[in-house]
Amino acid sequence: MCAPLFQPAIIQSVLDLDVYKINMMQAAYRFYPQTQVRYELIVRSDDNLSDLVEEVREEINRLAELRFDAAQLAYLAEKAPYLTAEFLSYLETFRFHPQQQVSVGIFRTAQGDCQLRVTINGIWHETILYETLVMSIISELRNRRYWAQIPQSQLHKVLEDKLDFLDSELKRRNITNFRFSEMGTRRRFSFAAQKTMLDVLRARVPELLLGTSNYHLAQEFNLTPIGTVAHEWTMAHQALVAVQHSQCVALDKWLEAFNGSLGIALTDTIGIDAFLSDFDLEKATAYAGVRHDSGSPFVWGDKIIAHYESLGIDPSTKTLIFTDGLDFARALDICEYFAGRAQISFGIGTFLANDMGNWTNDKGIRYQPISMVVKMAECNGSPVAKISDEPEKAMCEDIFFLMNLKQRFGLEVDLDKAIETLKQMKRQQKKRIQSVA
């Protein structure tokens, strides 16, 4: 019997994913229909997920049963008018083929521990939706296995306490520029927890809630679906065009894909300084705003505003969206700092969708969400990288490609660090000890 915060089948709708995945799917389908990609699961926290391998494989294989039905396609046509009729016709025939596209197994880390491995291979637009779904599956399976004793009342209590704090602080500090979207799908405690949380938010703070990044829940609760683009769009272009032009081409192609709609640029694939070098007057004018996802939000925002001003653009006409590991306290500090200087918005995920407060189990261990990502590792057989404005978020499997990428964008290359990284990579070669069934 499943606890109230869990359900027998985790993904029950093909729309139970992030909006930006379908946006990028259309762009990849249009511009790069034969491009091959590989994604890898990266577990950043200390959680050993290898015991879940069979359950993860089973849930991923169930994705083959999902379809875009007529009602869902009609909903997408209404709520996302930038999706073309041709693309929606393609979605009508779209199928997941997890047994051919996804390998689930175990590898041994450099420390000798076992860890879950999930690798996704295939044509870009045919595999792009797996990321959100795989992460949701892993998070819920882990919590169902080890944290099923957490009652729904704990989630309610944590949420109500947070919303009480928010209400109090907004009044005390007279903050009027705070609005946010819920973006917790990938790292949620469970589907039921995310649904419960959204139900609470729309009842308590409807005037502050802009929408959700989850298409299925947006449809169910009549909320606005929110989302634009992710790092993988820029990362893929590192393998699709000359690497020094990759960011510019990615920015231009995104505008072309949606005729200027969805004009929020993500700034930290290479890093904020490299981004601003490519974000010229034409692009800065065409894009409605930019999104922060790593590094200091205050330093970042100051740089963005100064850049707009240097181009003769009034920053108050542009939107700054913050999405990096936010809670309400941090978001309100950002609101105060940038009040009157630019339009501000927030995307908040784990803090709302996967926080159980100070809940501890009978062994005295406090609940913590998994820290994990599923990121593109290769495009057309070539490595790709995310450098980020926060070293812990940097990702690349090939140190030589990373050094070349940094050099091409005028970033400092630390040779001593590169040599040490090569030594570590040699020690940390992943060894498969269980292959896909």
From Swiss-Prot:
Pathway given in the UniProt record: Cofactor biosynthesis; NAD(+) biosynthesis; nicotinate D-ribonucleotide from nicotinate: step 1/1
UniProt entry keywords in alphabetical sequence: Ligase, Phosphoprotein, Pyridine nucleotide biosynthesis
Reactions that this protein is recorded to catalyse: nicotinate + 5-phospho-alpha-D-ribose 1-diphosphate + ATP + H2O = nicotinate beta-D-ribonucleotide + ADP + phosphate + diphosphate
A GO CC annotation given for this chain: cytosol
Post-translational modification: Transiently phosphorylated on a His residue during the reaction cycle. Phosphorylation strongly increases the affinity for substrates and increases the rate of nicotinate D-ribonucleotide production. Dephosphorylation regenerates the low-affinity form of the enzyme, leading to product release.
EC code: 6.3.4.21
InterPro entries (UniProt xref): N/Namide_PRibTrfase, NAPRTase_N, Nic_PRibTrfase, Nic_PRibTrfase-Fam, Nicotinate_pribotase-like_C
GO molecular function, one term: nicotinate phosphoribosyltransferase activity
Positions of post-translational Phosphohistidine modification: H231
GO biological process, one term: NAD biosynthetic process via the salvage pathway
Cited NCBIfam families: NAPRTase, PRK05321.1
Family named by the database record: Belongs to the NAPRTase family.
Protein's name in the database: Nicotinate phosphoribosyltransferase
Lineage: Bacteria, Pseudomonadati, Pseudomonadota, Gammaproteobacteria, Vibrionales
Gene behind the chain: pncB
